[in-house]
């Protein structure tokens, strides 16, 4: 959970006094560009330090947990780094080593995830030959290598075609049991079918936190579909 979580960049407040509690489930993070979604995710991943406030996991500050907290995380930033001359399989093996997986587990998990994101046939191809959607699918796979208890995905469906987005939704639905999954997107349909809760942000603040039915009921009679 977050307590009074605030992040400022100079005079600009990117995240403004957030107080939220998350339990196991899928959370969709919605908001316009500049709403504070990416900054919030980076704070939750302990990549950036808050200006004030705290983030707690089981009542313990994540700053004090250090590596123990990071071992529980899977993260896909909007633009993830990769070595263009690595094959998809070699890249996942490399990231597996960084995450501390042993040889046997790394091989097994890499193969499983390449299958899950439909890249098995391209596993030996160099990443520089991949389309944007293929790279994004590889990014989703690397975030899941360590079987994280907390999975944070920033714009995970960017570059995916409709068929790939359906596969992604099915993958997250299957993976989310007994885990916290947070994904930000501009594509409402990506979270409409899999998110138990929607977090809507504007100007660094949460303007709505609830299930999709609650959101639609609030605007009932104000929106018409043609």
Roles of regions detected by a PLM:
Residues 168-226:
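ABC transporter nucleotide-binding domain
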Residues 93, 97, 104-122:
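Conserved ABC ATPase "signature" region
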Residues 45:
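Helix-to-loop junction immediately C-terminal to a conserved catalytic motif
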